[in-house]
Each structure stands twice: as C-alpha cells, then as structure tokens.
Amino acid sequence: MPRNSTNKQMAVLSFIHKQVDAHGYPPTVREICGAVGLSSTSTVHGHINRLIKKGYLKKDPSKPRALEITPAGLEVLGITPKQTQIPLLGVVAAGEPILAVQDATDFFPIPPSIPDHDDLFMLTIQGTSMINIGILNGDKVIVRRQETANNGDIVIAMTSDNEATCKRFFKEQGHIRLQPENDTLAPIILDDVTILGKVVGLFRDDIF
C-alpha cells in the first residue's frame, strides 16, 4: 500500500480519536473529509473499512456513527488507554492482616470525584481497625497504585510475610508504624513494608 494512503489512514484514525475524546462520539464522514483534506466521502469510507480490517477501529452496525478506537488502534497512535473501570482485586484485612487476592472479581465505574484515573484498584475491607475514620467491615476502598507514602496517608501495605493490610502510615526513627483507626487496637511496628497504594476513595454497597 502506498505510504500516502497509510498516512491518510492514520490521519483519519487520529481525528476520530480526538473527536471521541473531546465530545464522546465520533465525527461524521464529512467532518473527517474536512479534517484530513479529502473531498470524497467514499475515499473516507474506504479508509475506515481498512482501519476496521486492521483491527484499529470497530463499528456497531446497529448504531449510526458508532466507531470506536480499539486498543490496537490506540497503540498504533502511541496513546495509552485511559482506565474506565476499577478492578476489585479481593479482600484486605483492616484488622489482622491476611493475604490479598490479586485476581479481579468485579469491576466498578470510576467516580467523577477522582480526577486521576490511572492505576486504580479496589479491595474489600475485612475487619474494624479503621472504623474511627468511617472505613467499615465490608467496605470497598479505592486505591491508587504507588510505592511511596507520606506520614498520615491511609495505605495498603504489604508486610514481609506477604500479607496486606489497610492502615495509616508513619515512617519513624528505625521503624514503620502502621496505625489503626480504632482505639482498642495497637499499632503494627515493622522494620520495613512494601506500599501497594494509597487509599483515595470508598465504596459502600449498603448504607442501612
């Protein structure tokens, strides 16, 4: 295929992505014509069909203008896909630490209150050690994946025994203190921990 034709295909793909990203729906064929410098709508249809065959676009035949950029299409454009759902990875203890299950069991939409959508996951809390700040047994916490934390952050931490726990993080002289938010429980004192992420949100199935 001539290089010019391939370049036009990439221009079409890029314009479709920009329009969907900005407006939530793809452009019309005539809008694509104007954006990429083509006068023939049939030529644009040809480029779209070839992009579909290459796996860069997909189309819902039951809906008009229902073009969607595929992961392969984003990759060829050099674009990292945005995370649109949060995977629920399992259970983490908010009392005695237990092993974290690293397989997604469900997916939840990202709340609009969380502007940065990248590297999020959810874990179900088991225990009552964080009840003073309203994290209850059975709640699901939204976690942003990161390896560092500031003193006072609520984190998901992995201990040297490969057990995960939700606590408030404090780095002190000679040790790490994982502080529960429950007046009846003592802190966990460790030489070192691995930070899996910072808690940035909360989801509760039942409010009564």
Curated annotation (Swiss-Prot):
Name the record gives this protein: LexA repressor
Protein role: Represses a number of genes involved in the response to DNA damage (SOS response), including recA and lexA. In the presence of single-stranded DNA, RecA interacts with LexA causing an autocatalytic cleavage which disrupts the DNA-binding part of LexA, leading to derepression of the SOS regulon and eventually DNA repair.
SUPFAM superfamilies xref list: LexA/Signal peptidase (SSF51306), Winged helix' DNA-binding domain (SSF46785)
DNA repair keyword on record: yes
Active-site residues annotated for this sequence: S129 (for autocatalytic cleavage activity), K167 (for autocatalytic cleavage activity)
GO MF annotation terms: DNA binding; serine-type endopeptidase activity
Record gene name: lexA
Family, similarity comment: Belongs to the peptidase S24 family.
Keyword ATP-binding: no
DNA-binding region: 29-49
Keywords assigned by UniProt, alphabetized: Autocatalytic cleavage, DNA damage, DNA repair, DNA replication, DNA-binding, Hydrolase, Repressor, SOS response, Transcription, Transcription regulation
